[in-house]
UniProtKB/Swiss-Prot annotation:
Species this chain originates from: Azorhizobium caulinodans (strain ATCC 43989 / DSM 5975 / JCM 20966 / LMG 6465 / NBRC 14845 / NCIMB 13405 / ORS 571)
Assembly with partners or alone: Part of the 50S ribosomal subunit.
TM annotation in the entry: none
Single GO term (MF): structural constituent of ribosome
One cellular-component annotation, GO: cytosolic large ribosomal subunit
Record has Transferase as a keyword: no
Keyword terms, alphabetized: Ribonucleoprotein, Ribosomal protein
Entries under CDD domains matching the protein: Ribosomal_L30
Keyword hit for Ribosomal protein: yes
SUPFAM superfamilies hit by this protein: Ribosomal protein L30p/L7e
Family label: Belongs to the universal ribosomal protein uL30 family.
Protein name, UniProt field: Large ribosomal subunit protein uL30
């Protein structure tokens, strides 16, 4: 099992507006910790988070993979 200091993270930035988007996409942005354009959120790099990023890939961009 990986130690806490070895946990990989991914930083995402919201580049698109949630206005006129389906509710599930808005909820996904909230789940990623984003709500306004150009805000950044650093999250643990897990399959669930990667799936959320893929779902709203037109609204976010990956800034850094660590």
């Amino acid at each position: 099992m990986a130690k806490a200091s070895e946990t990989k993270t991914v930083t995402v930035e919201q580049i698109g507006s949630p206005i006129r988007r389906p509710g599930d996409q808005r909820a996904t942005l909230v789940g990623l910790g984003l709500n306004k354009r150009h805000r950044r959120s650093t999250l643990q790099d897990t399959p669930a988070v990667r799936g959320m990023i893929a779902k709203v890939q037109h609204l976010v961009r990956v800034v850094a993979d660590e």
